[in-house]
Amino acid sequence: MKPTRLTECGNWVLDRFPVTKFWNDHMAHYYAPKNFNFWYFFGSLALLVLVNQIITGILLTMNYKPDAKLAFDSIEYIMRDVPWGWLVRYMHSTGASAFFIVIYLHMFRGIMYGSFKHPRELIWIFGMLLFVALMAEAFMGYLLPWGQMSYWGAQVIISLFSAIPVIGDDLSLWIRGDYVIADATLNRFFAFHVIAVPLVLVMLVFMHLVALHEVGSNNPDGIEIKESKDPWGHPVDGIPFHPYYTVKDIVGVGVFLLFFATVIFYMPEAGGYFLEHANFIPADPMKTPEHIAPVWYFTPFYSILRAIPDKFAGVIGMGGSIVVLFLLPWLDRCPVKSIRYRGGIFKKALLLFVISFIALGYLGTQPVTPIATILARLFTAIYFGFFLLMPIYTRWEKTKPVPRSLTKIHSLEEQFHTLEEQLPALLAEITAVKPLSAEIGHPAFKSSFFSRRPNTEGMINVIGRLAKKAKGSLD
């Protein structure tokens, strides 16, 4: 049969631009571990939020004025007079916080399951560069509404660069473009926020994904699925990413969008955490707010800065809290990747790290008090202790044996068959049968009856086994 003109046109394109090969290599024929769980939603959600930020950012840029005299009014114009402008603005502001939420959860999953360990060190490095670029993008975008908190928050952060010896003052002046935050600062931040940093973000996302698909995805058990393959060369413990995980991610996207829409339509300010109340007031260089604090996703690092008395040492501490994350692949000396098979020391250390990070984030939103400062110093010590002591406690911790392949997943038919075999024995254990004799009419018709009653001891044994099994699955 002669191919149609449309087919010929498609083949002509594919001969010159291998879309099908790209799709097969990175989706249809890319094998991912078959035991992905809830924690593996957040990578795809981060891509979704990035697309949302780019599209809504373009729409906002069409009406925004990067001028110190017009910036605040242009935001009000978008909110009040541009059709659906309020929705676009709230999608962008909520998307910024959502971006950091999914990124923080994505990073936590990487630490928990050892996704930074060999051979995925470069994936982790690209991911951390992405995180730094995202922080720069968020900081520069934070100034654009030109509200009170935007102005003074940027003033505080930029002034930190002046603490650097020798070059500090000149560096701060170069960043601002003026002796104070003014129109020049707003223009250069707008250019970086809209053009330069997004290009870096897209490039780093591409490099992150290429490195990931080269060495393969990690999994909750920390097993390398490429080490065992079937006769066709496919990983025994893997399944094609499409359609299995694309469908799974669609479910995650649906649930995420439900929460995302709820925040946008019912609480876009999130109690002053997503959009600060002070930012609804135009920037006034002559009036300092009573309490200056950055957006919530910067507050853990801001709290570390405030916990250290010396200004330069505080800047070093804040920068070091990010730099130490880059060194994680070489700080962890444990041969086991996943937390499922690691010792109790690492689990407790990770729990303390999470508590310290959340506590630092909360303290960063609160005014400075003596008690808050003491707590911030304590949690700062725990934060750095998790990383700096890692070469010691990870080398000596006791680990569990790691299985050579992923746990076999039985089919539904096999599960029912197993249940049919085990159910009679289970009933016999949790019940006690006692024979009863009864005469019906003539003694020749004497019959035996049985009474089945609960067996307390058997029930306790069954519950104990179930509890041990549940604890083992959680470990």
Residue spans for each PLM region:
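Membrane-embedded and interfacial regions of multi-pass energy-transducing membrane proteins
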Residues: 1-98, 102-423, 427, 431, ...
